């Protein structure tokens, strides 16, 4: 909507309406929305120590928090420069090659390595938005805005999962996490952005 040039009052109005709808749905239909373990993942972020007794048993609590707990420890143990890609102390994180690849990067390459990885992704997002802003075709602008926004949201959610700020929902880190369908769709998105860029760049041969 922002890329289409709509007024902020319409965008904020739509956001407020969506927020109200979600609040009403949770207030009256919370018992029918989501499965038990999905709620546990949300509650594990809000109350990781289970002080409110949201988990029915200690075994369930430990199982729910285990992956994020190990990921947090792995990132923290990496320090500034990490423990080395093939050496040093490594903290095992379940399925680290998927959703928690950032925890492995943090453990191996440290804070600096994470900054480099996220910096590359940030540059890609900025370039995507810039390509859309320079596009003379509205469709091209919409494509770049949508892809840039989706990438930005995906990166933010994955980082939040790894830092234990958001619940685990299976969102990958673009271009770094394993996953055939995810990588395929990302390359398709990059191809679309490159197509928009090429159609708005003068040819060297006139």
Regions found by a protein language model. Give the residues of each.
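Structural signal for the C-terminal ends of transmembrane alpha-helices
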Residues: 1-8, 122-132, 193-201
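Alpha-helical membrane-inserting segments
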Residues: 3, 20-28, 153-156, 160
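Membrane-interfacial segments
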Residues: 7, 28, 32-33, 129-136, ...
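Hydrophobic, glycine- and aromatic-enriched re-entrant/interface helices and adjoining loop segments
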Residues: 12-114, 138-140
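Transmembrane helix-bundle signature of multi-pass membrane transporters/permeases
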Residues: 16, 92-93, 104-107, 147-151, ...
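Transmembrane alpha-helix boundary/anchor motif
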Residues: 23-24, 33, 37, 120-127, ...
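Hydrophobic transmembrane alpha-helices and their immediate junctions
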Residues: 111-155
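A juxtamembrane structural motif centered on a specific transmembrane helix
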Residues: 154-206
């Amino acid at each position: 909507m922002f890329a289409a040039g709509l007024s902020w009052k319409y965008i904020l109005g739509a956001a407020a309406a969506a927020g109200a709808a979600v609040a009403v749905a949770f207030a009256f239909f919370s018992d029918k929305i989501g499965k038990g373990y999905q709620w546990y993942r949300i509650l594990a972020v809000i109350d990781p120590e289970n002080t409110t007794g949201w988990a029915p048993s200690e075994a369930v609590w430990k199982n729910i928090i285990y992956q994020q707990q190990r990921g947090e420890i792995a990132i923290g143990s990496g320090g500034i420069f990490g423990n080395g890609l093939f050496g040093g102390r490594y903290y095992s994180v379940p399925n680290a090659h998927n959703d928690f690849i950032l925890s492995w990067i943090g453990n191996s390459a440290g804070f600096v390595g994470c900054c480099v990885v996220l910096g590359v992704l940030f540059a890609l997002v900025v370039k995507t938005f810039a390509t859309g802003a320079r596009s003379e075709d509205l469709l091209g602008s919409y494509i770049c805005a949508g892809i840039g926004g989706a990438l930005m949201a995906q990166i933010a959610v994955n980082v939040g999962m790894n830092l234990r700020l958001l619940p685990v929902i299976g969102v990958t880190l673009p271009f770094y996490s394993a996953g055939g369908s995810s990588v395929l769709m990302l390359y398709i998105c990059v191809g679309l952005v490159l197509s928009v860029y090429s159609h708005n760049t003068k040819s060297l041969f006139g």
